[in-house]
């Protein structure tokens, strides 16, 4: 839909207003998207994790990341399987739907939407470890939860959280600005039922991960960044 079509659609909405009847009018914004991975995709990423752990010259990603956690290992998306089968179509449709909102891309007016996965890694975290507030490089980023050793209800009943008016133990949290310019947080509570779920979001959207407690298990998650394909820029020259 062109900008002109947007204006016409907006005028039509005004013309349809009924006298004396109030209705909500949501300000434009963009969503984040979520899904549950099919079993073949889950099996694929577990296999890639095993391969990364077995590598004698495994590539630690810790020096490139803000996480205060046990380990982050680079993963290999063999034959671009995960990107092509799980991410590509959805991500490119997202960028096409929200072209000027997804990134700081200076060429967004040229409708470039071809993407590739620039980075792909697995995170292993133990109790008391955390990821501070940060964003990512790229256009879109994603997180997949593979193993969650705690339940948020139990974590929020721990002494450090029980009497708080904002219990956060084990939470994942996004930060964004509301219509007043105030910073708001959107919490994603961690529970084993979320194992296998994926969230995709603009890379510049800030987020953090709080520590969990009273469990000796690992929290295992996968992250990755999607960028515009450099070949698309080359074709423009």
Positions of the model-derived regions?
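Non-heme Fe(II)/2-oxoglutarate
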Residues: 2-113, 119-131, 168
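Catalytic core of non-heme Fe(II) oxygenases with the double-stranded beta-helix
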Residues: 118-200, 210, 217-218
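A short hydrophobic beta-strand segment most commonly corresponding to one strand
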Residues: 141-144, 216-232
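Short, charged beta-turn/beta-strand-edge "cap" motif at the junction between a beta-strand
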Residues: 205-208
């Amino acid at each position: 839909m062109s900008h002109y079509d947007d204006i016409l659609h907006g005028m039509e909405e005004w013309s349809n207003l009924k006298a004396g009847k109030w209705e909500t009018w949501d300000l434009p914004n963009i969503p984040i998207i979520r899904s549950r991975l099919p079993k073949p995709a889950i099996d694929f990423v577990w296999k890639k994790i095993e391969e990364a752990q077995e590598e004698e010259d495994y590539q630690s990603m810790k020096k490139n990341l803000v996480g205060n956690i046990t380990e982050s290992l680079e993963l290999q998306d063999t034959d671009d399987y995960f990107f092509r089968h799980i991410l590509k179509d959805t991500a490119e449709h997202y960028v096409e739907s929200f072209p000027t909102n997804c990134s700081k891309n200076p060429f967004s007016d040229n409708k470039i939407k071809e993407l590739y996965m620039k980075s792909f890694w697995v995170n292993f975290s133990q109790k008391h470890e955390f990821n501070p507030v940060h964003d990512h490089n790229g256009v879109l980023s994603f997180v997949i939860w593979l193993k969650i050793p705690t339940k948020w209800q139990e974590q929020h009943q721990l002494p450090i959280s029980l009497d708080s008016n904002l219990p956060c133990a084990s939470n994942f949290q996004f930060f964004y600005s509301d219509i007043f310019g105030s910073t708001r947080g959107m919490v994603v509570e961690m529970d084993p039922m979320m194992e296998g779920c994926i969230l995709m979001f603009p890379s510049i959207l800030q987020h953090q991960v709080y520590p969990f407690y009273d469990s000796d298990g690992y929290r295992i998650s996968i992250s990755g960044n999607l960028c515009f394909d450099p070949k698309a820029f080359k074709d423009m020259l």
